[in-house]
């Protein structure tokens, strides 16, 4: 069981690192907490915050479904922060350093910190429509390739998590993780659970010692704690072995264990379904319209550099609505999928009043700022568009 879990952890951690540093992907759009952060702006404006995408909603739904089925198994098997934190503790344990076990009441008190923390994060995120705490986020520091929007404090927080993980088992996951605060109400009603056969149990307490979330497994008949990761460490630690004194499965399955393969299959199914849905139903994360839609329209599908976030998408719409010699008359609708690389943009326009060439000029030509009395260069470059015949790798080539 434990070996299978470590293989899954290694697989998802490798996938995350390779996706970010090898394939230069935008891992932020696959963060389930991003779906929580983006919800208010998407409902009220139809747009998403920063470089988040509709895929954040799909993966959030997938994680919620797996939480209702398996409790917080996402945290125990898939989350890179949880995996790194747990492996750090396992590494120092092999050196003979035992983790500090806090008194139960103190541990439970500290675990309440994540609820006001998530409330503060969501309040300011919803109020400003920006990821105001992104620069302090240890997970973003890991998956961002250390971009310019990472602050010194992100490394301080990350260092604190690393240092804490050497002393206490998974401290961030237990006490501070905002996603854990979101998942806990769903995990409370999780279908599967750990069950202890009270009649056969010898009360050795090894199951509780093995639990990374400090759940007193040896004192309950069924583990209903929302913080359970379904990691099955308690099941593995039971000296009774396969007799089923400590078992995992649906309610009432005392003395019988479900195969761990079922748990992993549910995790992979929920994840694969969420990823497939994001590609089958690729809704834009930014949409804005000017004017009334005519009877006939044309569409330009472009790949644009420096269209990395919601703010850049608003700036792109500003260029499309310019009122100088490159003005585009009539109807305009911009749908965008912001991305740190070459982002996709779909621009719908009135073909009787302009054409695709005019759209491209409006996006890339300098803009005269009448109030400032100066020309402003466009920050955007369109992949494959080189009006001056100058070959610039970044401006004309999709990375």
Task: List the predicted regions and their residue ranges.
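Short linker/helix segments within small regulatory modules
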Residues: 219-228
């Amino acid at each position: 069981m434990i070996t299978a879990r470590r293989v899954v952890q290694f697989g998802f951690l490798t996938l995350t690192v390779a996706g970010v540093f090898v394939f230069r992907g935008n891992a932020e759009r696959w963060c389930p907490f991003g779906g929580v952060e983006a919800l208010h702006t998407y409902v009220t404006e139809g747009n998403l915050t920063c470089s988040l995408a509709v895929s954040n909603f799909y993966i959030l739904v997938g994680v919620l479904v797996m939480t209702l089925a398996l409790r917080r198994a996402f945290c125990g098997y898939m989350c890179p922060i949880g995996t790194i934190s747990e492996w750090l503790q396992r590494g120092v344990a092999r050196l003979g350093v035992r983790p500090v076990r806090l008194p139960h009441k103190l541990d439970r008190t500290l675990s309440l910190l994540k609820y006001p923390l998530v409330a503060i994060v969501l309040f300011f995120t919803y109020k400003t429509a920006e990821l105001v705490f992104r620069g302090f986020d240890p997970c973003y520091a890991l998956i961002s390739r250390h971009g310019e929007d990472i602050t010194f404090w992100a490394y301080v927080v990350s260092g604190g998590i690393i240092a804490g993980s050497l002393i206490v088992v998974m401290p961030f996951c237990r006490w501070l993780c905002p996603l854990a605060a979101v998942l806990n109400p769903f995990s409370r009603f999780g279908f599967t659970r750990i069950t202890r056969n009270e009649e056969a149990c010898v009360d050795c307490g090894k199951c509780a010692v093995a639990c990374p979330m400090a759940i007193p497994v040896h004192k309950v008949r069924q583990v209903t704690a929302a913080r359970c990761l379904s990691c099955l460490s308690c099941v593995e630690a039971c000296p009774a072995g396969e007799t089923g004194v400590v078992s995992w499965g649906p309610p009432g399955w005392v003395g019988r264990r479900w195969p761990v393969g079922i748990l992993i299959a549910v995790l992979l199914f929920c994840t694969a379904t969420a990823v497939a849905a994001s590609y089958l139903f690729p809704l834009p994360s930014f949409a804005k319209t000017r004017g009334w839609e005519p009877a006939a329209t044309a569409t330009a599908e472009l790949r644009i550099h420096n269209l990395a976030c919601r703010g850049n998408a608003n700036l792109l719409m500003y260029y499309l609505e310019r009122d100088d010699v490159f003005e585009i008359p009539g109807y305009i609708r911009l749908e965008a999928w912001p991305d740190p690389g070459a982002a996709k943009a779909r621009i719908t326009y009135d073909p009787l009043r302009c054409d695709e060439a005019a759209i491209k000029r409006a996006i890339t030509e300098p803009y005269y700022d009448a109030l400032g009395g100066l020309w402003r260069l466009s920050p955007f470059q369109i992949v494959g568009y080189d009006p001056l015949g100058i070959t610039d790798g970044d401006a004309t080539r999709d990375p």
